[in-house]
Amino acid sequence: MKSVDHPVDVLPAEHSAETPGDARASESSLLISETFVSRQGEGELTGTESVFIRTSGCNLRCWFCDTPYASWKPEGTRQTIEDLLQLVAKSGVKHVVLTGGEPLIAKGIVSLIDQLRSAGNHVTIETAGTVDPGARCDLLSLSPKLRASTPDAKDHPRLAKMHAERRLPINTMKQLIQSAEATQVKFVVDSADELPEIDEVVRQLEIAADAVYLMPQGISVEQLDAARPWLEPMAISRGYQYCDRMQIRWFGNRRGT
């Protein structure tokens, strides 16, 4: 897989739970953790060659986050919108995935999305759906965070409180769904006990069952294989879809994939 390497700028810890704090920040540049070309490994576009642009910084703190370098300890470099547009154009790939961290908290993200789409690219936004900056995309890949995603309150009291307060703004999510050309809703599932909560979120979002994907929490093939026997039939029983994490099967759990 092709990747773009840049010097790393680690954010101060006091900024790590918010929109990245940087005196140089402007709407013409974004803090980018990494960019790479790979195959989409999750959801309805699985197997599609895509340019991935991972923004750094997140307003949530899922305990199982598989990209802590973009959330718990965000790092990256400032890149201009023009730099990112040129990177996509040079790749020759027409599907772009904006991911994170949480891409929708990044200053300049709406302008980047608009310009990518104006250039003829298909844009997927991978988001937890906690904020709505007014972006329009081709595919909204919405990942609502369930109660079990909250970090341990004993170890991280401030972050646990922040996460719990922010993780599930249903009205904001519905606005994002209304603005997108298409939507898939992906739940990271750690236990069968979470099914009633998933059902309730789906009901509140008023989303079709076949647009809902249940994906195992795990960063190894062994974890994925252990979850599938109970998670796949659970998804089917509700008319949902089972979602594997093919990037882990193809490449392992590593950056740039």
From Swiss-Prot:
Keyword DNA-binding: no
Binding site for Mg(2+): 67
Region Disordered, annotated ranges: 1-25
Annotated GO MF terms: 4 iron, 4 sulfur cluster binding; carbon-nitrogen lyase activity; magnesium ion binding; S-adenosyl-L-methionine binding
Pfam family, one: Radical_SAM
Keyword Iron tagged: yes
Protein family according to the UniProt entry: Belongs to the radical SAM superfamily. 7-carboxy-7-deazaguanine synthase family.
Gene Ontology biological process terms, A to Z: queuosine biosynthetic process
Entry protein name: 7-carboxy-7-deazaguanine synthase
Top-level EC class as recorded in UniProt: lyase
Pathway: Purine metabolism; 7-cyano-7-deazaguanine biosynthesis
EC numbers: 4.3.99.3
Catalysed conversion reaction: 6-carboxy-5,6,7,8-tetrahydropterin + H(+) = 7-carboxy-7-deazaguanine + NH4(+)
Binding site for [4Fe-4S] cluster: 58, 62, 65
SUPFAM superfamilies registered for this protein in UniProt: Radical SAM enzymes (SSF102114)
Cofactor: [4Fe-4S] cluster; S-adenosyl-L-methionine; Mg(2+)
Ligand binding (substrate): 39-41, 54, 99
Residue ranges constituting the Radical SAM core domain according to the UniProt record: 45-244
Record text on cofactor binding: Binds 1 [4Fe-4S] cluster. The cluster is coordinated with 3 cysteines and an exchangeable S-adenosyl-L-methionine. Binds 1 S-adenosyl-L-methionine per subunit.
Residues engaged in binding S-adenosyl-L-methionine: 101, 143-145
Species name: Rhodopirellula baltica (strain DSM 10527 / NCIMB 13988 / SH1)
